[in-house]
Amino acid sequence: MAENSTHSPREATPPAFCNKIVNKGQLKSLVHWAFTHYGTARTAEMADHLKDLGFRYATKAGVSISVDDLQVPPSKRRLLETAEEEIRVTEDRYTRGEITEVERFQKVIDTWNGTSEELKDEVVKNFKSNNPLNSVYMMAFSGARGNLSQVRQLVGMRGLMADPQGEIIDLPIKTNFREGLTVTEYIISSYGARKGLVDTALRTADSGYLTRRLVDVSQDVIIRELDCGTQRGIPVQSMTDGDRVLIPLANRLLGRVVLQEVVHPETGEVILPKNEAVSESIAKEIAKAGVEEVVVRSPLTCEAARSVCQHCYGWSLAHAHLVDTGEAVGIIAAQSIGEPGTQLTMRTFHTGGVFTGEVARQIRAPFNGKIKFPKKMRSRPFRTRHGEDALTAEVSTSLTLEGDDQTETFEITQNSTLLVKDGQAVKMGQMLAEVAAAGRNVRKTTEKATKDVASDLAGEVQFSNLVPEEKHDRQGNTTRIAPRGGLIWVLSGEVYNLPPGAEPTVKNDDYIEGEDVLAETKLVTEHGGVVRLPVQEEGKGGREVEIITASVLLDQAKVWLESLQGRDQYVIEAQKKQRFLLKAAPGTKVINGQVVAELIDDHYRTKTGGILKYAGVEVTKKGKAKQGYEVTQGGTLLWIAEESHEVNKDISLLLVEDGQYVEAGTEVVKDIFCQSNGVVEVTQKNDILREVLVKPGDLHLVDDPEAVKGKDQSLLNPGEELLPGLSTDELRYIECVTTPEGEAVLLRPVTEFPVPDQPSVPSQESINEAGRAICLKAVQRLPYKDGERVKSVEGVDLLRTQLVLEIDTDAPQIAADIEILPDEKDEEVSRLQLVILETLVIRRDVSADQTQGSTKTRLLVEEGQQIDPGAVVARTEIKAKQGGKVRGIRSGNEATRRILLMTDDDLITIETQGKATSASEGELLRAGDEVAAGVTVAESCQVIKVQDGQVTLRIARPYLVSPGAVLQIDDQDLVQRGDNLALLVFERTKTGDIIQGLPRIEELLEARKPKEMCTLAQRSGTCQVIYNDDDSIEVKIVEQDGTITDYPIGPGQNPIVLDGQTVEAGEAVTDGPLNPHDILEIYFRFHRETKGVYESALLSLQKVQNFLVNGVQSVYQSQGIDIADKHIEVVVRQMTSKVRIDDGGDTTMLPGELIDLYQVEQVNAAMSITGGAPAEYTPVLLGITKASLNTDSFISAASFQETTRVLTEAAIQGKSDWLRGLKENVIIGRLIPAGTGFNSYDDGGLGEPDPSFEGMPFTDDDDVIDDRTARNYNINDVKPFSGERPAYDPSKPGEQQRSMLGIDPAAVGDDTLIDDQVAEKLNANLEGDQ
């Protein structure tokens, strides 16, 4: 085929004759070939014809799917039987205690996985050989619809499913959709189905947002130059993963421009000269010649400012030509990476506990024969993940299989697993070895995982060759582990859980019958008292017994319900007609010091607010604001009344003045009238009237204010003179006031309220047990303190008399119940009683269940009986379900929680048929072991008794625990069925990378720091790995100059270097994902020691770029999606183009600024000419979001995210937007500078002034030019004024253009803004020209 695309269509070669089945792949290449040779129109026509052809034949053939087309391969049954047999053997090994729970699980999963794969191959084989024209087969394999995994579910088996936690369920779905699923299988399937739906929904959103960010970061990458003339490039090799080639070299080279000529490695002839693009045929030729690495030009190394040049980008993949200038390659790149995002899975199932790391390559025997090991083979025994014994090859070696007439040798690499022994006979298809993947990158990262081992039967635990060891961690917790592993036996028996406080009534080795009492619990009273048995409500659970330990009865007071203040309340009437209001409702509990009732009395009620003063009254110091202050000594309360009105209105509504004397009934504020004569006091703030006080009393004007000043706010006793001729006949309070008429004194009336020392209390009668005195005490409380001003319009209560419960006890938490009882003599009258009750709940009788026997409770007291503290009120007996021998009662001080009965159900007897028994008493036997010659036991057991001719065995189960397991039980413990015995700790390969698919791509492109990232070596040197006793590991690196650096290792990290190994700078020391920021920093530091800052920045950035490109590629490859490297490179270029200034030197740049690397370099070059200090900087890696927000264009950044922040910053810095990208232009509504619009803004007046441009005079008149005129600034449209157009001088683009337009170049700078009139004049010039 001719590859050269310069032919005109007529000369193009006709397609070569193709004798193949045209499936999807063939169709692709056919269309591609037509496209490169004949262009779009003719290809479209051809594709149309192909479509018609396809439909015509499909119709004629009648290709459709009916149920009969779903043919299940006949070998399915045989495969399932084999798998089930293998699993049965595994289960047997597990019940014998030969493998652990983890190994069993692993084996089951692997067996089913293998079966499922084998069946899939059978499906294909079956279709191919029996019915190649089957429509299902044709569809799936031509690539028209469906794929192998779907066909497998239709006619193979669905296989293993994961549960919602991502753990694999070890019950596979053995059926397919053709046969139909069982109910269980259907329900298992539904987890996965739901996950699929949710995943798809989330994926579209995620992928859309990724595309948006990508477009934003790379939208201004446009091909603006033909050749940037760079000398740098990147080496390209095939992309591999272990031994597998993911992307061959030929594919990666297609459409790239080579930097150096490609030379045939053997003949030395030049395959391709430099700066030439690699076409398909040349790519194949290069691959055939065996070239391993080609240095090509790449957008990553392109030196074009703010864009990529044509040569560095290479072919436009749509046309197989070099890309055109003005092509918006950034947007193409963004869409190429974003679009397949929907096809990536979000999270591959985290296959719970399943070691699906790299599946090791398996070697199977091609024929029957015998295995021979080489003489000097070094191997060590090894336990595989299925718990089988195998050998590990310590050095690379080979195996030989000798058959009857043929021999074959297999190469075995180091660390491979050998599943056969020397001289063993093997059958065809048997697995011989698992070969470890070779290569340095075989660092399988492992993580610790745990799995519970639960007991399958109740019984007694016995350790067999298991030595527990205690470990203390820093928090002081003790865990018991089995450092060397061993067996935990559970010997069968009926285990009874005892209720709390139960005491066994039997001893070990007692023999009891069914329904005998095993243990009993006593119900004991703590305080003693009078027994009261409440009436039982039908259907209620456990009975209660109440014991009254103390009570008090108000024997003279009557209680009745009365409606007060709109609700029903209990009123207590005592002697002397005192009436109390019950504050605590009947049936509630009250505690010591709580108010039970309050006296209804209005002796202490005032009419208005006022000031309260104590005279002789004493109160307790600590008063609670809520309850008031308790009176300790009586006396008199003095009350100086005053009215207070809270107003909070505008001052203009006030109708009186401050200090004015008013009569009762005067309107002081609009709609507010005073109730007494007195002086007005007004409080106001900011022209808002807060409150008005009216102070009643007699007002006397005084001539000499000083004479009364000393007596202000004191009391005037009756008959005492205040001023000559001014006295009073009752107690008054003196206050000096300022009135509109002048200074005056106000004598305010004082009301006296007497307070008695002891309030009267209703009589009470009480029964008290020892030390449980309980009574009601009357307490007087004052709500206000001495001198407090009380604001009120209605009036307040100055004193409250309350009945308070007093419990004289050392147990403060005791509460009393309030009860209302009918009187014994008179049914009509109710009395109030307070009782302290001890309530004991009697257990319900329960019938026996799995874990406990039946219980029976007997009550030992009767109603009204007086009992002492500590007396037994009731007994509960726990009975055995069936007869047996008692075991497991612990002697010593610890309480017995469980009792074991060894019943007949737990024993089996075996006849030895006269043969001598080989077992001894107490011996533990596993299923299949011999008791006597030729007599085996069906299940594992312990030998109890050996008699003539028969052996009595006790059923048991062994559980194997692996070394390092955490034990949850002790030797001789009793366990119920389902109790956890141990926690197996095992290592599993971390599945692939932490995450795959979209989240991983996002992590890479956003340059996120991964969790649990690995530690990298800072400099090259030799490792020292030290393993300490406490399981911690230290890694040190001795560098060339002898310095030793410590590398701390976090928890869960494993070193992947060996002692004495040499490492290079930037190599990983521990396992875990790489952090791109670390790579950049370490390589930059490393290169800075020997090279300049620019060179170091380029080299370190190139490392990171390489890492990111390969990272993104491998994710897409793992899902089988092909993306050309150049697209990823364009985006990565945008992420790695900036540096952070550390020190501005003599430049105008500020520390901390993010600036393009090439821009800083230009300024530094200028500095080196002028002799100024250059700027120092560090390269940075920005995620795509960060990079978008840091673009030169603030319009683009603001339209992406954080609009306000971006715009305010741009405004403060006075930024200008040069409108270089597509987005800015679209927002403003101009023609975009790509495609046909590319030339309309060609260089003319658009470039930023060169750094060398600094000396030119600018005239900047802040004039504005509008779009319509700005668009006409174009060299190409201008007719020269005189005959010849001056040759275009690229060194001074703007200047030359301006002179062509007849403008004085010196007068107008690149940044000058022109006003409309000038612009119109220019316009007229141009149009006149044309």
UniProtKB/Swiss-Prot annotation:
This is DNA-directed RNA polymerase subunit beta'. The gene is rpoC2. SUPFAM superfamilies: beta and beta-prime subunits of DNA dependent RNA-polymerase. In cyanobacteria the RNAP catalytic core is composed of 2 alpha, 1 beta, 1 beta', 1 gamma and 1 omega subunit. When a sigma factor is associated with the core the holoenzyme is formed, which can initiate transcription. It catalyses: RNA(n) + a ribonucleoside 5'-triphosphate = RNA(n+1) + diphosphate. Its EC number is 2.7.7.6. One of its GO terms (biological process) is DNA-templated transcription. It comes from Acaryochloris marina (strain MBIC 11017). InterPro entries: DNA-dir_RpoC2_beta_pp, DNA-dir_RpoC_beta_prime, RNA_pol_Rpb1_3, RNA_pol_Rpb1_3_sf, RNA_pol_Rpb1_4, RNA_pol_Rpb1_5, Rpb1_funnel_sf. Its cofactor is Zn(2+). Binds 1 Zn(2+) ion per subunit. Residues 1275-1301 are annotated as: Disordered. It is an enzyme of class 2 (transferase). DNA-dependent RNA polymerase catalyzes the transcription of DNA into RNA using the four ribonucleoside triphosphates as substrates.
